[in-house]
Amino acid sequence: AEFGINIRLFYYIGSLLNNIQGEKYIDACFKEIGTHILQGTLDTIQFHKECKIQKEEHTVCLPLRVNWGGGWSDTPPYCNENGGTVLNAAISLNGDLPVKVTLRKLKEEKIVFDSRDMDTHGEFTEIKELQNCSDPYDPFALQKAALLVCGIIPKKGNDLKEILHRLGGGIFMSTEVVNVPKGSGLGTSSILAGACVKALFDSVGITYTQEDIYDHVLC
């Protein structure tokens, strides 16, 4: 109840003020939603201290999604308060699965993200940079969140080089959505998150169910 009251208060006050101060309240509303979702998932996450990279390279390709009914009822904060039911179907694009994530083991102890469709590239050697995944303007927020929810890195503390040394090497993650524009309504962001989670689990040998994928993607 406190969550629902807080987000509504922030939103209504921000709407009434309708100025720079109001924008701060609107931002606070969405930050509250993000924190509620993230913490609810992160609190149940297990940091996999014993896992090791088991594949030199691994690629996951997934289809797009089209909604037949119930769209947005599964979207926070509505689904947090009321639940949600959506009827959808998986589709290919000209016979291809356009959502693609490739993981490759690196000799160097670092994390590298490469987004081909967004033309962005980033390299990380400090764990704090990877543990901050709440910035909506960060082009790699999704990839960082995948590392956290899969338990590859912990929520707080630790040393990235020690973790990667134990894993057996660094990680290169390439993400791409081929020939599908952002905002298409075909579920590219959530499906890309699912591909990242699935690729990470497969690469380090973590067993999972389809329900595990769904729960981790919600984060």
Segments the model singles out, each with a brief description of its role:
Residues 195:
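Active-site signature of alpha/beta-hydrolase-fold catalytic machinery across serine-
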Residues 218-219:
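Acidic/histidine-rich catalytic neighborhood of metal-dependent amide-processing enzymes
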Residues 189:
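Short, conserved phosphate/pyrophosphate- and ester-handling motifs at nucleotide-, phospho-/glycolipid
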